[in-house]
Amino acid sequence: MMNHPARPAAQLAQLTSLAQPALPAQLARSGGRAILADALQESRARTLALLNVYVASLGEELIVPDSPQLNPPRWEVGHVAWFQDYWIARNRQRERGIAAEPAHDRPSGRLAQADSWFNSSLVPHQNRWDLPLPDFAAPRDYLAASLAETLALLAVTPETDDDLYFYRLALFHEDMHTEAAVYMAQALNIPLPAALLAPARALPENRALQLPAQDWQLGYSGNGFAFDNELGAHPVAVAAGEIDSCVLSWARYLPFLDATGTAPPRYLRRSNDGNGNETGNETGNDVTDGAGWQCLVGGHWQPLNIAAPAIHLSWFEADAWCRWAGRRLPTEAEWEAAALTLPDFQWGEVWEWTASRFHPYPDFSAHPYRDYSAPWFGERYVLRGASRATSPRMAHPRYRNYFTPERNDIHGGFRSCAR
């Protein structure tokens, strides 16, 4: 990555176009100190707002079940504070950007055992429930102290991409954890205030978009921040074909359940007619109302909005619908090309499963946070887009999300392509 100067907001505002990501994502990746300072404080405010919701529901002990899809909330809070502290205040090579040596000697942290408690590279997921973590006040104070020092250092940091790299990384890292906290709240039946999610929007009518044949340059190139798995832009032959203009709605998904007898997805159930008899759609056509279905939101069952995106679907459920409908999932190259070239391609409601396994691009080189991508290549599938729980800063059309195919706790959905 070259050491280019960061761009001021006025210049970035001119970049919004069909071929550019939404402005918040571009600002976060290429903006200067003032933009980053505001973003870091906004992200921390969301972290604290979510923490307050958890405390109100669970108490200050913040005890949750041991599960592969959850993390102990006290560990999460400490980890977010530790990550920012470790990669910024304690990082003697932060001005080197991606050339920094990750294992260099660092000064001691503000919590004596922080490295042994909160370093996710050293603490396996299953061990996090057994750590002798400090009481609730210590991680909260850790959050405040780490942010204060980060902002003080940022104020005197040169405005180049190398110098700002770790500030941007810490920002995106915290945004990822606040999104994970939204997923975990749903899994724990914790209701969230509406302000912590983007407003729900009914999907427009789906249309068949024609994606022309092309050699698509897959991946990120240019100035500003990029995740290591986005780099290595390379041409990929994309065949001409048809792709949905928007993600699948429940109205399109539910007939598959009735036609095949497939069990409903997570957080979805059939309602009944008042006499204990389940109701449903037996016609195989698009569902026109949600009278036969309910969804679980924040611990409460409510009528399903069938115009809303189908959500909390695993890769297997998305693929099964496609096979039933004679369709297929797009590859990540098809998705990226459509998002950046087709004006009517709508995205941002749910993370979208693709047919592509998460593999490195050519000449992949891990960035200093070594465990961000490399350990997960091959076993996961790529999701593209963003969801209502995603910070707008993360909603970049070249961003590669990735999960194991059974995950149905995330805000995952899909769109389809013609075979």
Task: Describe these PLM feature segments.
Residues 202-218:
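Extended, Lys/Arg-enriched charged tracts that mediate electrostatic binding to polyanionic substrates
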Residues 2-15, 21-62, 66:
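N-terminal regions that are enriched for targeting/export leaders
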Residues 2-5, 37, 45, 62-119, ...:
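Short, contiguous alpha-helical
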Residues 213-233, 260-261, 271-274, 291-296:
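Short acidic N-proximal helix/loop "leader" segments that mark the beginning
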